[in-house]
């Protein structure tokens, strides 16, 4: 549904709520999602697709998963962060090369320097002079916990 008032299924996130969440949590401008349609498939699994296709066919999967909403704290997905995280202006932790390599490999690490919000963050590193999102981290009590799924974990070269 476009807005909460148009909701047909109790608890289902509206387009407005999804866009607002990305703006409030990560500072991603609403215009970023201008041509993006959102679908909920499964319990709170939000999919994004860069078009709007009218179809009589029941949708089973379309686009990429970007958010999980049927829990106390909404959680961005790795694919969502990789797609929209470059536009983020808040709650992005920039990792040094060795930290980025450990994070991408799925390792948790102590990082006491973060002074922003606790909770889900976008972990990023510098690649070719640009900030590149690696994935989702959960920051609690001075520890950055990698939430990179096993299928996305990789070994990054540590460049100086």
Language model features with spans:
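Polybasic, low-complexity RNA-engagement segments
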Residues: 1-160
């Amino acid at each position: 549904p476009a807005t909460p008032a148009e909701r047909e299924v109790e608890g289902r996130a509206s387009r407005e709520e999804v866009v607002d969440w990305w703006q409030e949590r990560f500072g991603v401008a609403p215009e970023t999602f201008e041509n993006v349609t959102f679908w909920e498939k499964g319990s709170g699994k939000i999919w994004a697709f860069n078009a709007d296709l009218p179809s009589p066919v029941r949708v089973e999967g379309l686009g990429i998963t970007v958010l999980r909403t049927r829990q106390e704290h909404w959680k961005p997905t790795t694919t969502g962060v990789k797609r929209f995280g470059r536009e983020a202006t808040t709650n992005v932790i920039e990792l040094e090369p060795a930290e980025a390599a450990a994070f991408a490999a799925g390792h948790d690490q102590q990082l006491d320097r973060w002074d922003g919000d606790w909770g889900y963050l976008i972990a990023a590193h510098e690649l070719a002079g640009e900030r590149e999102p690696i994935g989702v981290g959960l920051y609690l009590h001075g520890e950055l916990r990698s939430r990179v799924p096993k299928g996305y974990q990789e070994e990054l070269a540590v460049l100086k």
